[in-house]
From Swiss-Prot:
UniProt keyword terms in alphabetical order: Ribonucleoprotein, Ribosomal protein
UniProt lineage: Archaea, Methanobacteriati, Methanobacteriota, Methanomada group, Methanopyri
Taxonomy, superkingdom: Archaea
Alphabetical GO biological process terms: negative regulation of translation; translation
Protein name per Swiss-Prot or TrEMBL: Large ribosomal subunit protein uL13
Record organism: Methanopyrus kandleri (strain AV19 / DSM 6324 / JCM 9639 / NBRC 100938)
Gene3D superfamilies on file: Ribosomal protein L13 (3.90.1180.10)
One Pfam family linked to the record: Ribosomal_L13
Keyword 4Fe-4S: no
KW Oxidoreductase (keyword) present: no
NCBIfam families membership: L13_A_E, PRK06394.1
Reported function: This protein is one of the early assembly proteins of the 50S ribosomal subunit, although it is not seen to bind rRNA by itself. It is important during the early stages of 50S assembly.
Gene name for this UniProt entry: rpl13
Single Gene Ontology MF annotation: structural constituent of ribosome
Signal peptide: none
Length: 159
């Protein structure tokens, strides 16, 4: 886990920890969006291991189009880091232009890997059954980590 300078201290008892490993991105994001709108604080770990279904080249081209769509100074801005991609996907499922949506978005944390505070508190992360990859009928998918590298992000520690 990479600790970023902007990482604020977290009280583990206030946060529900969800593991994104082998979870379909859109399904997981919709569950998380509903729960943070209800007032729950959620930390999603291992976001680089979440998957997007479809063929790798198609997914890469779609994301490159999104990134290159706007003006570099004015936006829209699309992230390349897996944790920020996850947050952006959840943001798209919230009423972002309302106070309620922005307040809900503040209750979401996304991490690459497992943060130190989760390991120290010995928290068992929750898995979202509706989002599990085992429900897929095909093997066409790409992980968020792979997509990020294709978009130009360099994963720390060579993950």
């Amino acid at each position: 886990m990479v600790e970023y300078a902007h990482s604020k201290p977290v009280d583990p008892e206030e946060w529900t920890v969800i593991d994104a490993e082998n979870a379909v991105l859109g399904r997981l994001a919709s569950v998380v969006a509903k729960r943070i709108l209800k007032g729950e604080r959620i930390a999603v770990i291992n976001t680089e291991k979440a998957i997007i279904t479809g063929k790798k080249n198609t997914i890469k081209e779609e994301w490159l189009q999104k990134i290159q769509r706007g003006d570099p100074k004015k936006g829209p801005f699309y992230p390349r880091r897996p944790d920020l991609i996850f947050r952006r996907v959840v943001r798209g499922m919230l009423p972002w232009k309302t106070k309620r949506g922005r307040e809900a978005f503040k209750r979401l944390r996304a991490y690459i890997g497992t943060p130190r505070w989760v390991e120290e508190a010995n928290i068992e992360p929750e898995r979202v059954a509706e989002a599990d990859m085992s429900r897929l009928g095909h093997l066409w998918y790409v992980t968020l980590g792979e997509l990020s590298e294709e978009l130009g992000y360099q994963m720390p520690g060579g993950q």
